Design a protein with these regions (language model features):
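Lipid interaction determinants
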Residues: 17-79, 85-129
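Bacterial Sec-dependent N-terminal signal peptides
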Residues: 1-3
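Bacterial N-terminal signal peptides
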Residues: 5-15
């Protein structure tokens, strides 16, 4: 399994209380305020993948040694670019996710973010400092 596959294999689900739109999807401006200068900890199969989002549209991620070995990927860290398009967080890693761009709708409850990717995959993350 490649690193990108582990990132998406989390199998996490949105809360049963409603759809992402009902739970208050973030606007483009809200997305920027939520992630710029922050580390977002993506929850993956019992681990957290920290992703840092810089104001210049760059991002970087680093898996723990254990998570990277479980992923059997070709690297435990990667970088890429992010942008906001149509009130979605879009990102493209250099190697992870096969270097393909993906966009996500996000909703936030406190420090928890629920996301839905354009292909329907879902998951959660937490916002750090």
């Amino acid at each position: 399994m490649k690193v990108g596959a582990l990132v998406l294999a989390a199998g996490l689900v949105l809360p049963a209380t409603g759809t992402l739109a009902e739970d208050g999807a973030l606007t483009g401006d809200q997305l920027r305020k939520t992630i710029v200068g922050k580390t977002v900890f993506l929850k993956i199969s019992g681990f957290e993948l920290p992703i840092k989002y810089a104001a210049n549209g760059r991002m970087s991620g680093k898996m723990s040694t254990v998570a990277a070995s479980l992923a059997r990927g070709d690297g435990s860290s990667d970088s890429g670019k992010w942008w906001v398009e149509n009130d979605q967080l879009c990102q493209k890693w250099t190697a992870w996710m096969d270097g393909k761009p993906y966009c996500y709708k996000l909703a936030q409850r406190g420090q928890t973010v629920h996301w839905v990717r354009s292909d329907g995959r879902t998951g959660t993350a937490r916002i750090g400092g």
